[in-house]
């Protein structure tokens, strides 16, 4: 096992512990708490993959951080902070929408890279809106916290979330997963729209009908899917 992988996990465990203390003292806001919960799932997955105990890793991580801080000069710390771009937290969903439990009549789940896609295949002929909470840096989506698909009645019928055991994803991973979710929902004659906020930061533009700009590859894939569906409908007739 690579030593850097282990030390990175140990430091992440300790930093999570520090952030947990901030929340326990009621000093963290909602986005801070969202990231804390997401990172907790990620650390559990990484710990299981690496075969490391989180409590022991936290103790070692504390020692690593204390050593770095002891050697770090105040001036160097100021320069580091000044050169690090700040990310923003974007909230399409309310805390209630983000934390609500939901159930599927005909569940379907697919893993697309480091992201897990879930949808209810029983949903048909509905108007659906995709909304997400995520962080942004340089006006581009940086990290997806959670994406959910809502009907006009407010029911949750789909979801995209990072895999706890597979930390880290790119904006292309997110866009590909959104394409898969849209394709799955549209298969049952649902009309899917993407929130303007998500369009702006994921694609850099917005579409008046609520659909994300599609790449030529995505357009060809959707065209093949449509032709296949038409052939099956004719055979059924």
From Swiss-Prot:
State the gene name recorded for this protein: NS
Q: Where is this region: Disordered?
A: 205-237
Does the keyword field hold Ubl conjugation? yes
A Pfam family assignment = Flu_NS1
The species this protein was found in: Influenza A virus (strain A/Memphis/4/1980 H3N2)
Report the protein name in the record.
Answer: Non-structural protein 1
Enumerate the residue ranges of region (RNA-binding and homodimerization). Answer: 1-73
GO-annotated biological processes: symbiont-mediated suppression of host cytoplasmic pattern recognition receptor signaling pathway via inhibition of RIG-I activity; symbiont-mediated suppression of host gene expression; symbiont-mediated suppression of host mRNA processing; symbiont-mediated suppression of host PKR/eIFalpha signaling; symbiont-mediated suppression of host type I interferon-mediated signaling pathway
Taxonomic lineage is: Viruses, Riboviria, Orthornavirae, Negarnaviricota, Polyploviricotina
**Where does it localize?**
Host nucleus; Host cytoplasm
């Amino acid at each position: 096992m690579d030593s850097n992988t282990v030390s990175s996990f140990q430091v992440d465990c300790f930093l999570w512990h520090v952030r947990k203390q901030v929340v326990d003292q009621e000093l963290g806001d909602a986005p801070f708490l969202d990231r804390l919960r997401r990172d907790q799932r990620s650390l559990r997955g990484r710990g299981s993959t690496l075969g490391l105990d989180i409590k022991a890793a936290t103790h070692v991580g504390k020692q690593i951080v204390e050593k770095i801080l002891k050697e770090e000069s105040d001036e160097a710390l100021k320069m580091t902070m000044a050169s690090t771009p700040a990310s923003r937290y974007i909230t399409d969903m309310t805390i209630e929408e983000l934390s609500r439990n939901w159930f599927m009549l005909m569940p379907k789940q697919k893993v697309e890279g480091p992201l897990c896609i879930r949808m209810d295949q029983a949903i048909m002929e509905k108007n659906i809106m995709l909304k997400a909470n995520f962080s942004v840096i340089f006006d581009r989506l940086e990290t997806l916290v959670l994406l959910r698909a809502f009907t006009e009645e407010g029911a949750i019928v789909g979801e995209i979330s990072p895999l706890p055991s597979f930390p880290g994803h790119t904006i292309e991973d997110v866009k590909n997963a959104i394409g898969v979710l849209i394709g799955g929902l549209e298969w049952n004659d649902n009309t899917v729209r993407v929130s303007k906020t998500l369009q702006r930061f994921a694609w850099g533009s917005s579409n008046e009908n609520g659909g994300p700009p599609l790449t030529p590859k995505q357009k060809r894939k959707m065209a093949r899917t449509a032709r296949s569906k038409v052939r099956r409908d004719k055979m059924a007739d």
